[in-house]
A protein has these predicted regions:
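Electropositive, surface-exposed helix/loop patches at the edges of structured domains
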Residues: 75-83, 108, 222-228
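Asp-based, Mg2+/Mn2+-dependent phosphohydrolase catalytic module
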Residues: 1-7, 99, 105-106, 116-228
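Residue-level marker of regulatory loop/turn positions in helix-turn-helix DNA-binding domains and
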Residues: 90, 112, 145
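Conserved SAM-binding loop
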Residues: 17, 90, 109, 169-170
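N-terminal helical cap/lid subdomain that shapes the substrate entry/recognition surface
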Residues: 2-103, 121
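Conserved G/P- and acidic residue-centered "switch" motifs that form tight phosphate/ATP-binding loops
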Residues: 12, 16, 113, 172
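Glycine- and other small-residue-rich loops at beta-strand/loop junctions that grip anionic moieties
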Residues: 46, 112, 192
Length: 228
């Protein structure tokens, strides 16, 4: 990887580094059911994948008559975090890929996620990657606009003092991929199949240049990538 083609690598977290979407959305499904909106886990994933609860607050209110407020979000996050603490596992191959890429770009890696910072720290610590990212963890909820706007990726590039156009982004959702593309980065997709990730064609349709099914392939794919 001596001639690595990117100055930095920016990772989404949920569904890229950690297999959190089924856990988070199971909790969300239960809590929406308590409000009267009865969904299957697959339906919840389809609606909320790559988004925050607040993104869909108008729809929740339309379906339940309940206006999502800060108190409800606090209860949701508490239940979600307890489930993540108990059950969370890394995406297979992700820790090894992160450490390999950390070495390839001399530590210039960052997390750029739409999730809240407490969740990000919990998840990175749980899978043993907090040390790799250090302070280079950016939450879209702390930006003026969250994904699909590019703000979180632009902010992550700034923390590393790199040009976004010289960054590779790794995403698994259409919402996140749109953000990376809008930031001017080269976006690679991860879509292993099954619920919890956008499908490969949907990612390609929004500007992703290549989709992986196995995260273990990521370092070699990025190292050998040439613009086509």
């Amino acid at each position: 990887m001596s001639h690595f083609p990117y100055d930095a690598v920016l990772f989404d977290c949920d569904g890229v580094l950690v297999d959190s979407e089924p856990i988070t959305n199971r909790v969300l499904t239960a809590m929406l059911g308590e409000l009267g909106w009865r969904l299957t886990l697959e339906e919840t994933l389809r609606i909320f994948l790559g988004k925050t609860v607040f993104d869909e607050a108008p729809r929740i209110q339309a379906e339940t008559g309940y206006r999502i407020d800060d108190a409800w979000i606090e209860r949701f996050r508490a239940r979600r975090n307890a489930a993540l603490e108990s059950e969370l596992e890394p995406i297979p191959g992700a820790p090894e890929a992160v450490r390999a890429l950390h070495a390839a770009v001399q530590g210039r890696i960052a997390v750029a996620s739409g999730a809240d910072r407490v969740k990000l720290r919990l998840q990175l610590e749980k899978i043993g990657l907090q040390d790799c990212f250090g302070e280079h963890v950016v939450s879209g909820q702390e930006q003026a606009r969250n994904k699909p706007w590019p703000d979180v990726y632009l902010a992550a590039a700034r923390t590393l003092d790199v040009d976004p156009a010289r960054c590779a982004v790794v995403e698994d959702s259409v919402t996140g991929a749109r953000a990376g593309v809008a930031a001017g980065a080269t976006v690679f997709g991860y879509s292993p199949g099954g619920p919890g990730h956008s499908d490969a064609q949907a990612l390609l349709d929004v500007g992703v240049v290549h989709v992986l099914r196995d995260m273990r392939e990521l370092p070699a794919v990025l190292a050998g990538w040439q613009a086509r």
